[in-house]
A protein has these predicted regions:
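NAD(P)H-binding glycine-rich loop region in Rossmannoid oxidoreductase-like domains
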Residues: 38, 49-91
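Glycine-rich NAD(P)-binding loop of the Rossmann-fold in SDR/ketoreductase-type enzymes
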Residues: 87-95, 137, 141, 145-146, ...
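Conserved Rossmann-fold NAD(P)-dependent oxidoreductase catalytic core, especially the SDR/UDP-sugar
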Residues: 97-142
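NAD(P)-dependent short-chain dehydrogenase/reductase
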Residues: 152-204, 209-211, 247
Length: 304
């Protein structure tokens, strides 16, 4: 994709930052966030991204340009232990509706949701039609339910304003500087325990940064009205136990896995719809994680 104009929200987050940087090579990209970290802003600007200090939930959207082709909405509130449900709904759902109402003339709207909106079902691969629930309740009580609310708002706005839309339910994203496998890698390096749910093995469908970037481009091409809801994940299912064991082997250490009910449950994905719409991912998880280990990548949220 070349010569298009993008608005990317939540641009200091792991996924949004990578998307913005990659898109900026051939497109005009405006990234909005609070930018409390000067280094995060500098990294984006060095890649050619125009950074705008902006709170999408509270600031006046009229301050932004009006000629974007695409809006990639990845900003969210997700705080461990948070119990302010009203604020979570306001930020994740209501403010998303205002964003879509303001930019209703765009070519497509991309909404980043989460597989934690599903009701946990053990090792069953979760289809897009699976019952919804609250998989993050023990870790972040407001997150899953506010994302369910946000999906409802996005569906309404897509249909009401006629905006081609994709609701992408992310499973486990990871890359050079973020994601669950990176948190586990840091724990392995420091000899710290890795906490997993007792319902072992903990299956997921992790997707690396290079793959999820290509997926976004393909999803924008199939955005529709009504909104298309799709799992956003890797084509391969693998357990956290297996990837921890693999990275531990590469490091020459032992993985200290501790099972606790406080860890969120696994969310393996059914990939049939995703494959039918945008095809398979290209990178084997072992290859991607080996690169992370060898390059010394680490997650900013890693254990101390």
């Amino acid at each position: 994709m070349k010569g298009k104009k993008f608005l990317v929200t939540g641009a200091t987050g792991q996924i949004a930052r990578y998307l913005a940087i990659q898109l900026a090579a051939d497109n005009t990209v405006h990234a909005i966030a609070r930018f409390s970290s000067a280094s995060a802003r500098e990294r984006l600007e060095q890649a050619g991204v125009t950074c705008i200090k902006f709170d999408f939930a509270n600031d006046d959207l009229a301050q932004l340009d009006s000629d974007y082709n695409y809006v990639l909405h990845l900003a969210t509130t997700q705080e461990p232990g948070d119990r302010d449900f009203d604020n979570a709904i306001e930020v994740n759902a209501v403010a998303t509706g205002r964003l879509m109402a303001h930019f209703h003339n765009i070519d497509a709207f991309f909404f980043s949701s989460t597989c934690s909106v599903y009701a946990p079902d053990g090792h069953t691969p979760l289809k897009e039609s699976h019952p919804l629930g609250d998989a993050m309740r023990s870790h972040c009580p407001t997150y899953s339910m506010s994302k369910v609310a946000a999906e409802a708002v996005v569906k309404f706005a897509a249909e009401h304003f006629g905006i081609p839309t994709v609701i992408a339910r992310m499973n486990v994203a990871y890359g050079r500087d973020g994601g669950l496998p990176l948190i586990h890698l840091e724990a392995l390096r420091k000899g710290k325990p890795i906490y997993l749910n007792p319902q072992k093995p903990n299956y997921f469908n992790p997707v690396c940064d290079e793959d999820y970037y290509q997926q976004v481009l393909k999803m924008l091409a199939v955005a529709s009205t009504p909104a298309l809801v799709m799992n956003w994940c890797g084509s391969e299912q693998v357990s956290a136990e297996e990837w921890c064991g693999y990275m531990a082997e590469l490091l020459g250490v032992e993985a200290n896995i501790v099972y606790t009910d406080n860890a969120f449950p696994c969310t393996p994905c059914d990939t049939a719809l995703m494959h039918s719409k945008i095809g398979r991912t290209n990178t084997h998880w072992r290859d991607a994680m080996k690169v992370l280990v060898e390059n010394g990548a680490g997650d900013v949220r890693s254990v101390g």
